[in-house]
Amino acid sequence: MASSRCPAPRGCRCLPGASLAWLGTVLLLLADWVLLRTALPRIFSLLVPTALPLLRVWAVGLSRWAVLWLGACGVLRATVGSKSENAGAQGWLAALKPLAAALGLALPGLALFRELISWGAPGSADSTRLLHWGSHPTAFVVSYAAALPAAALWHKLGSLWVPGGQGGSGNPVRRLLGCLGSETRRLSLFLVLVVLSSLGEMAIPFFTGRLTDWILQDGSADTFTRNLTLMSILTIASAVLEFVGDGIYNNTMGHVHSHLQGEVFGAVLRQETEFFQQNQTGNIMSRVTEDTSTLSDSLSENLSLFLWYLVRGLCLLGIMLWGSVSLTMVTLITLPLLFLLPKKVGKWYQLLEVQVRESLAKSSQVAIEALSAMPTVRSFANEEGEAQKFREKLQEIKTLNQKEAVAYAVNSWTTSISGMLLKVGILYIGGQLVTSGAVSSGNLVTFVLYQMQFTQAVEVLLSIYPRVQKAVGSSEKIFEYLDRTPRCPPSGLLTPLHLEGLVQFQDVSFAYPNRPDVLVLQGLTFTLRPGEVTALVGPNGSGKSTVAALLQNLYQPTGGQLLLDGKPLPQYEHRYLHRQVAAVGQEPQVFGRSLQENIAYGLTQKPTMEEITAAAVKSGAHSFISGLPQGYDTEVDEAGSQLSGGQRQAVALARALIRKPCVLILDDATSALDANSQLQVEQLLYESPERYSRSVLLITQHLSLVEQADHILFLEGGAIREGGTHQQLMEKKGCYWAMVQAPADAPE
């Protein structure tokens, strides 16, 4: 297939993908500053009347958004599909579109906000006129100051919504929200409580500012008492709302966990038989239980904190803008310095820590090597050489320790100095605003307290976000099971009132999916008739159990057809089919529940105690069950280890007989039964009046059962070598006769 890249013309040097991305972004921002800043206001000054400044700034902003969005699409299109050379650029390129939106909407949104808060105030129009005109350089810089943090937040939150990778499970957040189901209302109520609690929490800074003004103005005692009372009421209400919100959220996450775990387990149960052979039971259970529990715990703790601080930060940002746009812009501009610089220095410090540990390990290795080989060191008189080598390693550690100390000091310094510079900047600008009368001293105190809470909220969000992203990413493993399409055919619709039990294998071939080139069965053609017992015998590995598995619809033939009363087996409804076709294996599964429930396992209608007892009597299980202290109510452990092999087989046979199947499969199901129980099974197969209402496929080691069969098939190498009654096959003196003469090689 031809490459999708066109060859570059001779003499032309193509830019790497990352360089192209940087160049396109720089040109886009340069065009925004040089062209859009001056051109768009001039164009709309001709189109929009001067009397409508707010409409004009919105027209400029939306047009700017459209142009920048088209440019961002062009840059993305030029770099999409490139290989690993610009894999690193793809991360920040994804923020171009939200940056375009933020740049276009920053000034219009700010202008609208200023208009709303200054509604009806004298001189308010003049105070916002510069903001209305986007060509002013200061306003344009303000748009970038507001847009960069907004775009970063938008991009970070948007990365939680990205679809899964190849073969993934789609959008993980949408899938998790889909698991809420009826709990969506509760989550909505939780978000409302978060908003109300966050607003109530802001009462302390607000009333602290008002009390500051009261102190400076020497206000009345009633004003002080009223403000203090309101602050106390709002603070208590905020705490109560937070408590209720946490309770609702944790309860909702508990419901989501139960629902999700049930859905995953149900999806696993719908998979084909090969799925359970290719995946270990422990791995499957890890997905069903541990992965869902880990996801639920992570979402309950981390997502709750993330939502609280996200809403709190947004509320604080809105109130800060309400209080002072200029001080808020100073806060937003310094946020990258406040968090990114300490983060970079912290990485340098962590790298030095790793190097120190590695150097310590190397020095220890030198000492261990010398001490463990002292005879060799002494025989070569190299004691001083080993000591010198150890001193060199210690010198390396000393140098690294000095660098680590410097890095620690720089890390601590950058964290404290960046926070201090922000406070100094706010106090300096705020002091000028107080001096000019633009804000009161109390308002400045309130803003400083809000700014401290806002900075703390951003810091918490930056620390929690990776954990939330990891939790959302881990949900993709769970959704792999939910989205996996079973390879077995869907359940059919046939549920006839009467089924004779005529089974026809028509040229059936089969190979297991994990070894498709190895045919286990080759062109099998035979019939199981109602009222007859067909015995299937042959050496180990000849495919007898595979025939039983095909008849249970656990696998699908790779060739030929398997018919039940003339209809393909998959056309029957799943539950109906397994009521009519019952099987008992050599090592049947007994579940961790009562013996009564084990016998009635899988029945949609609960059988009576008489029916359960009758089935147990026929299988030989009643004799030992009745001797137990609690009888049929005796609880069995998870693996049924308290029962012997014969007792488990008897219980499993009763579980099959209670269904009154028209097709009964006994796959070495009597190998562990005692003599009395085997005699009961023999009478059940050949003397019971019910034998005429069912077809029986018998696979057994006991020749006494085989000899009485109506038809015997000898299977070898996946093909039927001979068939007939016991007498006919013995007269032929073929494969069956040889097997009978050699008991050690008797069939399974």
From Swiss-Prot:
Keyword Membrane included in the entry's annotation: yes
Superkingdom classification of source: Eukaryota
Gene Ontology MF terms: ABC-type peptide antigen transporter activity; ADP binding; ATP binding; ATP hydrolysis activity; metal ion binding; MHC class I protein binding; MHC class Ib protein binding; peptide antigen binding
Membrane topology field: Multi-pass membrane protein
Cofactors named for this entry: Mg(2+)
Reactions catalysed according to its record: a peptide antigen(in) + ATP + H2O = a peptide antigen(out) + ADP + phosphate + H(+)
Location in the cell: Endoplasmic reticulum membrane
Transmembrane segments: 16-36, 54-76, 93-113, 134-154, 187-207, 228-248, 299-319, 329-349, 419-439, 444-464
Family according to the record: Belongs to the ABC transporter superfamily. ABCB family. MHC peptide exporter (TC 3.A.1.209) subfamily.
Name of this chain's protein: Antigen peptide transporter 1
